[in-house]
Amino acid sequence: MKKLIAMLLALVMALSLVACGGGDSNTAGDDATGDKVVKIGIFEPTSGQNAGGGKKEILGIEYAYSLKPTVTINGEEYAVQLVYADNASDSAKAPTAAQTLISQGVSVVIGTYGSGCAIAAGPLFQDAKIPAIGTSCTNPQVTLGNDYYFRVGYIDPFQGAVMANFAFNQKNSSNCALIIESGDDYSAGFGNYFQQEMERLGGKATVLEFQTGETDFSTIMASVKSEGYDGIFAPVSIETAAMIISQARDAGITCPIMAGDTWDDISIAQRTGDKATEIFFSAFFDAADTTNEAGKAFVEGFTKWVAEDNARLENNGGVADVISSVTPCGYDAYMAAVGAIEAANSTEGPAIRDALAALEIPGLITGDLKFDENGDAIKNYAVIKTIQDGQIVYFSTFNGLE
């Protein structure tokens, strides 16, 4: 029955994707009153170095909310209210943001962009028995040992292997500089999986570390040149990405510069201009994929919805027709949340958690959704994107690894 309900939800979603409803993103559901309200917590960074990605995930969540602002529980309609907490891109501040959501009485949480904040907040959600649905946080530690944390995107062991295979087999980069942010869970974790797969393939990835907040990468670039590395892999934030690209090209380094899902952000192309050559990164989704029927409908509806509001446009990088792949992750996480609430016929966290564990929703934007025993989405698909003429464009597809 739970699976049937979820499938029906997906059908309703597909039929309604052409709609472009919405409201004030800062007051989503705030006008809901009475007992028939269910609160969904939005645990995302709107400040700090990951704010750009967090805002794009929130756009996906809010667009999904505009299409389905209510849920049905035991035959009665409940209004969804979105409750926001800024984790500030900081794992030290993330527990406070999580506690804010818990104290507000949310039934389920969505987020976050940035694995470190998810890892830091996870135990609080688990202790409070409030399920959380990760969006683009890819570190395995997010869900490991936490039966209340799920996620809709793929995880770093897969993503790291994809990018190592791409570097080694498609770009002939077998001796890579691995630039990571010291102490950052996402950067170190993702980099480690890239390094492991590169070594398995017969290549090498040498770690070059920098400190959080560092802006001068001249020492690292000098090492890249002197050691003759034929590729750079840099699993770093949006802000840092632009600096690494610009400083590498200014130093005369021409080798491919590669990364992961965080780089799927138009602001990187905007900030680096004609220096953004030979840039490649993995992503959850590509708007140019014409085989994705749900994706085509999403692109059409989301583009119109973003264009209707200046604040949405600003949070989307100032354009309506460019969609970061983390935005569909936000969308899919919201649909998973409301699907689980309806399948559970409850606003109680433990019941929603159990419904999530059994949930199957076909035809979401990043693919069919089903969770494994760890709460991770079962995914074996990724796209590779590049930057051309100031735009992020599709390059290739990975469907499984040998």
Question: Model-flagged regions — what are they?
Answer:
Residues 1-39, 70-76, 103, 398-402:
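Short, low-complexity disordered leader/linker segments with a strong preference
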Residues 24-32, 52-59, 71-143, 152, ...:
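Beta-alpha junction/loop-to-helix N-cap segments that form part of ligand/metal-binding clefts
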Residues 34, 41-62, 85-91, 114-116, ...:
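Extracytoplasmic "Venus flytrap"
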Residues 86, 142-166, 207-209, 273-288:
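Short beta-strand elements at the ligand-binding edges of bilobed clamshell
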Residues 149-212, 230-231:
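An alpha-beta-alpha
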Residues 191-288:
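Extracellular/periplasmic bilobed ligand-binding domains
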Residues 250-329, 386-388, 392-394, 398-400:
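Extracellular/periplasmic periplasmic-binding protein-like sensory domains
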Residues 307-328, 338-391:
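Segments of small-molecule ligand-sensing domains
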